[in-house]
Each structure stands twice: as structure tokens, then as C-alpha cells.
């Protein structure tokens, strides 16, 4: 099974047949193949949807396109979904995550920035990942023991090298121990079933999710991005754990509609700055984000073995 779109190719043939949803706003689209009963099944996740009496609501808008792989993909993404030509033609560079995870500081970042001069590949971005902030959710409170000169200094040093400056955030997350979670418990999402605070991710020992439909939350997120992009001067944001916003449906909206609302809001507050999505359903950000991480963490060993 899969989500948003899928394609088939008969053995020995070059042509493919693609089935894809135009939008996930109505609800996430699930494609499944039942090999036992020889069935191809298309479902929409509309749990939580509330309609008024007599209201019409389009559930499915599906394209079926057959032909050469490149032509089919162009017709689906550009003509049907409405994606525009990517703003980024080539994105290659450095991220602190895979070498250090959260164990970064100013000395490490500046050392690696200077060391990138020796890279043989074309590099156009240098991205600082998790570990600069005092707590997840308190994005404007830098850990000054690790980064005594602050994050504007880091962005400035990256620009001096001629690279775009990138930084990681999880804008919908609030670490359990963060000031935001303690000061604004009314901002936190709660389970529909029992009203308990919802953990949106397990990072930092657990993090809650702040509700984007609360006006004060939206203002806080706008303030964060204004500081990061316009004061600190970063050019790209890597936005993580975005799925946490749509774990459960609410307010009469499906999970898909909630995620689309969240993605649209992030594009609004980021303007024309680059967005690299991470931990986000891909169908909701096609044509809106500039790029997406599509894999798990890269490591030199397997932490979990199937036995």
C-alpha cells in the first residue's frame, strides 16, 4: 500500500500507469493492492470530518495517466497537482546532524565550516541541525554555553564563505521541559479520547504539540520565523516532526486537511525562503515546500535488528 499516488508497470513494458490524488486536503489517499483477491483499492481517510446538513464535499479527485515514466510524472505533478518548477535546481552541502546529532557547539560548527573548503563536490548550503536551542520549542532561547556568540554570528560566518545558511526547527513541537510547554499548557494538543496531553514525538525525552488553530500559537510561530529568517539571517529552514500536528483529527477536519493547513501556514510565515520538509506527509507539501527529506537517519550501524 502507499499514499497520495502509485504507479504500475507490467513486466517487460516501458510504459507505466499512474494513479494519483490531486490533493490530500480532503483526507489522506491510501492505495492498496490485494494480491489474494486481485483487487486495487483506493481509500480516503476522512475520520473526524464534520459536514453540515446538505453540504456537498468532494472526496476523490484522482488522475489515471499512462505513458513514458518522465511524461507521466510531469503530467501528474505539474499539470494535475499544479506543482511549479522547483526554485532549487541543485541543493548540496553540509548538515551537522549525522556526525554529531545534538552534540554540537560553536567551535564544532565553525571548524567544520572552515573544513568545507576542502570539499571536492559543489556545495551551496551549510545547515545547523538540532542542538543549538535551550529546549525544543524555545527556539529563540539559544544555549549560550554552546553558542556564546549566538546564531546570527553563525549565519554571518556561513555567508562569508559564500554558502546559504540553513537551520533546523520543529515549529509544532514543545519539549516537555520547555518554557513554552510549562507557560502555555492551553496551547498543547490533547487526545480526543481522554483529554491527556499528546506527545507528538519522542525526541528530547518527549515533546508535546502546539495547536496551530489557536491564534496565540500562530503569532508565536510567526515571531520565531521572523527572528530566525530576518534577524539571524538564515536562508533555509529544515522543519521537522510536522506530522505531529495531524496525529488525530479535530475541529471537524480530517488529518489531511489539518496537515495541509499546517504546511500552508509555514509557507506563509517563511515567505520565499527555502523550506526543507522533514517528518511530513509528502503529498501535503508537493508544490509548496522546496524539498523534503524522504528517508530515515543515516548511520553506520543498525540499531534495531529483526530477530
Question: How should these model regions be labeled?
Answer:
Residues 122-307:
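Aromatic- and carboxylate-enriched substrate-binding clefts and catalytic-loop regions
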Residues 1-193:
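Conserved structural scaffold segments of CAZyme catalytic domains across common CAZy folds
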